[in-house]
């Protein structure tokens, strides 16, 4: 389409700088009004492209297939903010969707060659669900269709040695102190539902990571079909100075230009490595330090099984505590139970294969070793509940990962010029609170809101520093709480004292016993109330209860069908399913019941 010279002059005058941009809620720009007066109504789409382009030449070569919904949104003088995102994980995709919905021009650079179904379930607490709903109603509704609620059921801590009938630590009564027939109960229950109800938020639960990523990718493609470039990771950047943007260096040797680079490329981030002058993936001789991370002191084994336990529908997740280790189980939907076994082992104590992070894949140390039997041997004398879960798990599906984390970056900003890091790149977390993905989603939302307030690229550096200041206190608290949970369970807790047996007689056992009321009535309520206190939607009224009721019926149907299938065909588990990468296709295995 050709425009008259007077129209071009008018448009150029309206867009005083090709680098200027305003929030997406600005209604009608000068350029829009001027263009409308110069062209007929049948070129409305082109007039919007003019406002979003740097030059008239760009108008005639605008990429086909751009979503008309985006073009119909309130206009920006000049052009949209151009954002490059390193990494197409949960944090990167959430950031992309947030920014695309605000009219930014976003490209995600992802190392994997193509999207594939990989990775295990991910927990979303009430705070993250509030953010997801605020980002997009359709996104939230689609996630709820794939969601499994755990926070509406009993969740908490059990004694790993007494949790099958002899446990005397009831929540609401002191009968266990003198009555050996007092019913077995939980050591501590988590107030997940009560804290969610306090703020009127959806309840904590899980969703399979592949389902989540597929939904995020689909919602992004509705706005910009070619928003993601697969098979081309970010491996560095060159800052061009204030207001001049950043050159993004890609793995294939090419470069890309952007106003902002977001490093969402995980714990071994290449963007972070350059920002902080770290040698990427460099590991110390003793294995305890790696690219600014410290070995947490814990290794974790993971597995999944389809199993109908006696309390399957009544419990969400359980943490079994014992000397120098703990064992976690969670309902993850469709009759499946996901489990994690944490041990205080030195780094490099590798037994099982792992594909976590894309660089730590290795074969099983001893292919002939039965990993389930190995883990059972480390839980001698533990509850039959733990043994039943392990016995039903195909040994081939077991995986392992050494856990690394970082101290909060209180003295170093997450931003360098027009480059910023989010998620695990700057605040990796121990998995105990299930807040790793949640905090990455909070990052995505806050960063997008902060950048939307900018009116010029000259202000971007300050905006990124503002983002860091907005997030550092909350993220640091959550990081410390996550680490403290592991340290307490492993180093301070032991089998609780009971007057009815000799299982817990050490000083740690007495300490654990006296921790019970403090944890139940003070620490855990305060902890979860703080986590859920960030909820941009505000209260959702009766919606959380409606969602849970709708899910409950379907959950029973799906689970019973899975139990019937296992009864007939045995366990069928995709492995690796937790820590694998897209380059490593899943292998389906079956373990027929005897």
Give the positions of each predicted feature.
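Central beta-strand plus flanking loop segment that forms part of the substrate or channel wall
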Residues: 208-211, 218, 268-315
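Glycine-rich FAD pyrophosphate-binding loop
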Residues: 100-120
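Conserved FAD/dinucleotide-binding core of flavoprotein oxidoreductases
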Residues: 164-204, 208-211, 252-256, 289-294, ...
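C-terminal helical "tail/cap" subdomain of flavin- and related membrane-associated enzymes
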Residues: 56-84, 143-145, 155-177, 181, ...
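Active-site-adjacent segment of FAD-dependent monooxygenases/related oxidoreductases
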Residues: 118-219, 489
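Extreme N-terminal leader/targeting segments of oxidoreductases
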Residues: 5-12, 21-27, 33, 38-83, ...
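A conserved short coil-to-beta-strand element within the FAD-binding core of flavoproteins
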Residues: 230-246
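Conserved mid-domain beta->alpha element of the FAD-binding
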Residues: 85-88, 92-101, 262-263, 268, ...
